[in-house]
Swiss-Prot record:
InterPro entries per record: GGNBP2
UniProt-listed PANTHER family: GAMETOGENETIN-BINDING PROTEIN 2
Biased composition (Polar residues): 476-486, 546-557
GO cellular component, as recorded: cytoplasm; nucleus
Basic and acidic residues bias (residue ranges): 385-395
Region of interest (Disordered), residue spans: 372-489, 532-562
Acidic residues bias spans: 396-420
Protein name in UniProt: Gametogenetin-binding protein 2-like
Ranges annotated as biased composition (Basic residues): 373-384, 455-472
Length: 671
């Protein structure tokens, strides 16, 4: 806040008081104070420009001659008012700036130095600022930003500023802000402000008594307290409180009183006592009383506080308004002068600032576009390098996997060759056919596949690997079959070796005349044979409980097993039954020949009866018979389960859906 440095009356000539950046301020009816803006400064004050800003303004400064510069930096009142109406939205600020403009034009005060308002109603710049480009450029530097920052304190959704809004004093009471204006005043201003004329105090007291309708007795006490204050009556009255008037000094010859300025607490108490009266907070409580002289003294102090409140508030509002008006006038004036200067520069250089700005923006955009393209190319190059690196890694992975697959296949072939050599050695052994059973060689366990990174060519590699493995196993099977054939042929050609097939067929042909291997009885009288031929449903004979053949219970299942094993005596013996009997006897010989020989015999049997794979009719009929029995038993079990469930529900008191439906049906029938 600006300082109040001097106080004088309105009748005095202020030409000798008002200096640079000083402005007279109305403080009362006949009281004037001098506002000093040197301590606060104006918004147009800024540090000297240097560097690029100075070079740019120097170029514009040199384009114009001295006469053109003078002409460009001088505007009339009409141009100023037009710019003012465009920039300032608050009506109160505009009216105050207009009054200040005309006031400074008439008086010629240098309040806005280096701006000057001439008697011709024109706004210009002092001669010193026009000589150097640095001084002039500093004054015109960032004028638009300065104006926007100054006018940016208006309320939201309102055109008035905070100072000229109706809510300016409602938000914060003056009793909390009066210290600001009190601290901005010098001692001479404070002393002059605290002088109260007795006539003024008496008028305020009369209005106060009429407002609150004091009774005659109370009015008398208040008037006596007033006369004691101004010194008309002696203070030796009954009930007088001297401490209430302790900080008020009376001047009887001059007919005024002085409020002590060094007692801030006393002033604060006076203002807080008077604030409800000034704001109208006690308007509903109009009737007041002063029963004692002490209460009457307090009522007189309330009137003194009302006078001080009005004076301080008037100075506070005037000081803030004049200070803001000076700031706005200076900012708008610099803005208007700068616009006029730029117009002359554009006319001289033949191109407007807007076009220059467009060219500068275009250059910046082109630079950004080039930078984006370079960044895009760099990113694309980096992406291509990454892609090539991935391709190389994939190729290396494929090569490694192919090498691993080849090595794995090579190992499998070596294992197969070793197994074939072992089988060849076993078959070439002369005692290999003397009832010794050759166990099947264990198939080589497949080695776990080597894990590799998932690539797009993995399905192709897997299919290729499967084909190679399949070809290898096919080749191995063909080699084994060829080796087995080559080994069986010497056995058939050699008459000294035992032919297993001929032995089996000769033993089948002599089954009637031979003896039973179990009980050593003749075959027609063999009880084992009779048990086998028995296809009834009797129990197992106890006399042959230890027999292996009669250990199976004579039942339909046992009969079917015996029939499937070729042990049944059918009337018609076809080739199929002979073959089944052949293989059943072959299984009873405890496998006294090699696996390769059994495989060759099965291949010959499969070649002869290639089209005999079908389900016999007896098996189909037995399945149907069992199916009907199973279905019937299932229905019986379901009915039994349902009956048990309903019985349990009845026992536990639970009503089932069937019982509900039965009750509903019975109810409908009853109706």
């Amino acid at each position: 806040m600006a300082r109040l440095t001097k106080v004088y009356n309105t009748d005095d000539d202020d030409s000798g008081y008002v200096g640079r950046r000083n402005l007279p301020l109305v403080a009362g009816d006949k009281l004037m104070m001098l506002m000093d803006l040197n301590s606060k400064g104006l918004v147009i004050d800024s540090p000297l420009i240097r560097g690029r800003e100075l070079e740019e303004f120097s170029r514009k400064f040199k384009l114009l001659t001295e006469a053109e510069r003078r002409q460009s930096l001088e505007i009339d009142s009409a141009s100023f008012m037009e710019v003012l109406n465009q920039c300032v939205q608050c009506v109160g600020c505009r009216r105050r700036v207009e009054r200040l403009f005309h006031q400074l034009t008439e008086t010629g005060h240098r309040t806005l130095d280096p701006l000057e308002l001439r008697p011709t109603a024109t706004l210009g710049i002092v001669e010193e600022k026009l000589k150097t480009p640095q001084a002039l450029g500093t004054l015109l530097y960032r004028h638009h930003e300065v104006l926007n920052n100054l006018l940016d304190n208006k309320l939201r959704n309102k055109t008035r500023c905070v100072l000229h809004s109706l809510d300016a004093f409602r938000a914060k009471p003056f009793s909390e802000t009066w210290r600001e204006v009190w601290s901005a005043m010098k001692s001479n201003c404070r002393n002059e402000l605290t002088i109260i004329e007795t006539k003024e105090l008496h008028d305020v007291l009369e209005n106060y008594l009429k407002k609150h309708k004091f009774c005659s007795g109370c009015r008398t006490k208040i008037e006596r307290a007033y006369k004691i204050l101004i010194g008309e009556i002696s203070s030796k009255e009954k009930g007088y409180a001297a401490q209430l008037y302790a900080h008020i000094r009376k001047c009887v010859p001059d007919q005024h009183i002085h409020v002590t300025t060094n007692k801030i607490e006393f002033l604060d108490a006076l203002i807080k006592r008077a604030e409800p009266e000034v704001n109208g907070s006690y308007s509903k409580l109009r009737e007041r009383h002063a029963k004692t002289l002490e209460i009457a003294q307090e009522e007189v102090l309330t009137c003194v506080g009302m006078i001080m409140y009005e004076r301080l508030r008037r100075i506070y509002v005037s000081l803030r308004e004049e200070e803001r008006a000076c700031q706005v006038l200076a900012a708008v004036g610099v803005h208007a002068l700068c616009r006029s200067f730029d117009t002359f520069v554009e006319q001289k250089q033949g191109i407007s600032n807007l076009e220059l700005l467009y060219q500068e923006i275009s250059r910046a955009e082109r630079a950004k576009q080039i930078k984006r393209e370079q960044k895009k190319l760099k990113k694309k190059k980096k992406k291509d390098e990454k892609k090539n690196l991935l391709h190389r890694q994939c190729d290396d992975t494929e090569a490694n996997e192919s090498d691993e697959e080849e090595e794995e296949l090579r190992n499998e072939e070596l294992d197969l060759e070793e197994e074939s050599q072992m089988q060849h050695e076993e078959l070439s052994d002369p005692g290999a056919d003397d009832g010794i059973v050759i166990e099947a060689a264990r198939s080589p366990e497949p080695e776990p596949e080597l894990t590799s990174k998932p690539t797009k060519s993995k399905p192709k590699k897997q299919s290729k690997k499967k084909k190679q493995k399949k070809a290898a196993f096919t080749k191995m099977g063909n080699q084994k079959q060829m080796q087995a054939t080559a080994r069986v042929q010497p056995l058939d050609a050699d008459h000294d070796q035992l032919d297993v097939a001929s032995c089996i067929s000769s033993s089948i042909a002599k089954t009637v005349g031979d003896k039973c291997e179990e009980c050593l009885a003749s075959m027609p009288n063999c009880p084992c044979e009779q048990d086998v031929r028995d296809s009834g449903y009797g129990s197992d004979p106890p006399s042959h409980a230890g027999s292996r053949t009669s250990s199976a219970i004579s039942s339909p299942e046992g009969s079917e097993v015996s029939c499937s094993d070729g042990l049944c005596n059918h009337d018609v013996h076809d080739e199929d039954s002979d073959d089944l009997l052949f293989y059943s006897h072959q299984s009873q010989l405890d496998h006294k020949f090699s696996l390769l020989q059994m495989w060759d015999d099965f291949d010959e049997y499969d070649d002869k009866d290639e089209e005999t794979y079908y389900i016999p009719q007896e098996v189909v009929m037995a399945f149907k018979c069992h199916r009907e029995q199973v279905q019937r038993k299932r229905e019986e079990l379901r009915a039994k389960l349902r009956a048990n469930f309903e019985r349990l529900c009845v026992q536990h008191g639970v009503q089932t859906q069937v019982q509900k439906s039965k009750r509903t049906t019975s109810a409908l029938v009853g109706q």
